[in-house]
């Protein structure tokens, strides 16, 4: 007879394989739709460019001019993605003028920089302007600090280089290199022929920032005409001599300090938070993970790192800055293509020299603006600066973000915060866990908000709506989220609803959840009017009341999380499939390698759970883009649900997907059953392979405690490929699989690992007959 096998949607690991009968027990890269399992969609990188660091924050918005942008916050930088390019807007921490700061060693690519001003840390970024040559090297542009010492740090001369394929090839980098300097090349892809990575070449025909290479000192320049190249290339130059101090007068511009890529546990007395653990016992603590919060204020962006200040990026200046010219006069006059209002802070950059009176990296303020022409002052509303002397090169207004407090109209802007949120409905800017008014002390339970429609005014007054309030339940605010009618605020022990009241209170907080937990600021997702979040031992939801979310994977998930890496956990929606995703580090892992999904649309609204393996660092499901976006460990963004394969790095790879059922009785009673064939029910619709296929495996058991029968088959096979053979007039595939299996219980598995394959399972049928009882099985033989 033929028996139809129909299993419930979702994966259940809360019980034994047998207790979870009629369901599914394990999965990887499989989802449920309309009650049946299918392989998830593929992913494609959005461009071939990459960013530096691990991305932990994504935000999508559109400017007044219709430009679609994404804020990308990493542990090393902050970028704005536009058209596949990652534009660096990392704010500046400080700028100083140094005299002969560089020390070189002959044949070495390491340069030591002396700067007694301090404030820099390992992995920070610094840009140099105005340097003169030292032993064949003119050190210009941006570098990452590799090692710090007392009043010194080191950098490597390795910098990006572009190669123009020609006869001979032309190389362009941020450094100026003298003829006969030794260099090596490296790449993330392939170098054009005949260039070979890590081979010594010599600079010839140098001219400014361009040069050519020869295989020998003073030899003929290398020809790359007709060749091809891929990836990002780097050139590393070696000093031609040893000098303790050189480079002339140098302007050094430092970006804000970088942060760690993952959580580094610390141990010892006082390392943990106050009140944590047993009195007198050293608790574990962590170096702070670099987490960003961000949101658009109109077309501009407000952003900041957890535990840091608030920054503001002005969309008027653009993602690459704005070119300008200076009329040397008393005062100097700047002419550019954009209109900037008085009080706007600006920083200037150049590939040459600014006139006397102005310097690279210094914050100036627009004064006497008439639109696209204005003067500059050292302070907001101050006297315009007189310029003199000469100038050279091309000048630009920097595209980098500024401290919000640096704007001329700024008043009592918080100097430190743990989370930023912009109210879409009421146009307030909120800071959570910030410093009190007129104090530098951070209060982890304090909420402050700006005046309505004014991101710079944080001073409460009878004439505005700026204000603050302090929450009482918990020890710190973790995160916040804008929902339809309220702002939800999570502390480490409670959930509050923040609602707009109007003057004079402006905003009020109501406790809506107690004795809860939340693992990180990014562990909350909002979909279909409901907020979902991951706690430290369970999942929750809030739909007007706080509830524990039933989870069929609770024990499986929470027994396999690296609790030291809680802060890395993040969530996101995939609303096209009614899904909430959480990504986490499995036990012993310091990087994200697992995910768990709650599908709130399955099981008649009760939802379904499933899980799998995937390495991601951030997620964004935006209605302003065609696909959900994710950040990867390949330092790029990928579109999910795009295609059926893995194209994270530019090379198309197959996605391995599988699902295994729980054990189910083949037939009620104590009789064994002999199965001679299985009739698959599957569709390969959407596959791009010519003959897509997967493997169906049947796993027989005598009873729930016996383990799988070995050998699994009786003189035949227990698995076979299922292949599509036609698509018209109907989709045809392997109609039946012949097996020889004798068992009382069984589990089944379907998997695929080939390129171009996607599938959805239906209801398989088994052709079987009764086959007596087995001796030694605990029942009488027969």
Where are these regions (language model features)?
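A short beta-strand motif characteristic of beta-propeller blades
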Residues: 43-49, 277-281, 402-411, 464-470, ...
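Beta-strand initiation motifs
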Residues: 86-88, 318-321, 399-404, 456-463, ...
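Hydrophobic or amphipathic alpha-helical targeting/insertion segments
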Residues: 88, 298-313
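Surface-exposed extracellular loop regions of Gram-negative outer-membrane beta-barrel proteins
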Residues: 487-513
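Small/polar beta-strand repeat architecture
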Residues: 1-3, 14-15, 19-20, 88-292, ...
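Beta-propeller blade signature
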Residues: 444-453, 594-601
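Beta-rich globular "head" domains
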Residues: 120-130, 175-182, 340, 344-345, ...
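Beta-sheet repeat architectures centered on beta-propellers
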Residues: 1-96, 255-265, 269, 273-274, ...
